[in-house]
Amino acid sequence: MKVKTSLSTLILILFLTGCKVDLYTGISQKEGNEMLALLRQEGLSADKEPDKDGKIKLLVEESDVAQAIDILKRKGYPHESFSTLQDVFPKDGLISSPIEELARLNYAKAQEISRTLSEIDGVLVARVHVVLPEEQNNKGKKGVAASASVFIKHAADIQFDTYIPQIKQLVNNSIEGLAYDRISVILVPSVDVRQSSHLPRNTSILSIQVSEESKGHLIGLLSLLILLLPVTNLAQYFWLQRKK
């Protein structure tokens, strides 16, 4: 009886220590798969499960939550959710002035451009800010011309300087009345460098982080402990019987 109780307790402990918790919920299939692949490449034990509305959720070992969030954050995950034209111009929205309508339209365009730029390989964060021209005042003086600023944070191991003309052209063609020379692009490389393939990988066994080379040794040690547990219980049982 004691042996069975001890084994049941051990199995329960091992089961609880190996449980996974939600890391992110309500993410798209595409982004979820990218995040899952990234976590596994970094040596973390991660899984995905179906979520509401066709979305998925990511699960990791509870002890890996902080590390997983840090890894994904440094790689720009999860991506920002950008507004669409439908969000900016709801069907039941109130009537706005022409200036307000133009401002909302350009904001929606800036959001769409940011979304497009974020799809480029290596882009971690993309922002587009548009400044609208002022109306002509009563004295007949012209206001400041429209301008746009593009901010891109990218992976440090990718050169983005050659993309600047294409980025400016994309913004120029998307915003009406915006001159090419009134567009500025700021590129900021991330301090994080992509992990090289020759670096050692870690894996998680029962919430214990070990290298791939040490995984077999840990499994062997745990197996030995499981085998020794009933042996020690039997030895204790026979010793108590002899004392009686």
Curated annotation (Swiss-Prot):
Membrane topology summary: Lipid-anchor
Superkingdom of origin: Bacteria
Signal peptide feature range: 1-18
InterPro entries on file: AMP-bd_C_sf, FliF_N_dom, T3SS_SctJ, YscJ/FliF
Principal localisation: membrane
Swiss-Prot/TrEMBL keywords: Cell outer membrane, Lipoprotein, Membrane, Palmitate, Plasmid, Protein transport, Signal, Transmembrane, Transmembrane helix, Transport, Virulence
Location in the cell: Cell outer membrane
Functional description taken from the UniProt entry: Required for the export process of the Yop proteins.
PANTHER family recorded: FLAGELLAR M-RING PROTEIN (PTHR30046), YOP PROTEINS TRANSLOCATION LIPOPROTEIN J (PTHR30046:SF2)
Family, similarity comment: Belongs to the YscJ lipoprotein family.
Protein name, as recorded: Yop proteins translocation lipoprotein J
Source organism of the structure: Yersinia pseudotuberculosis serotype I (strain IP32953)
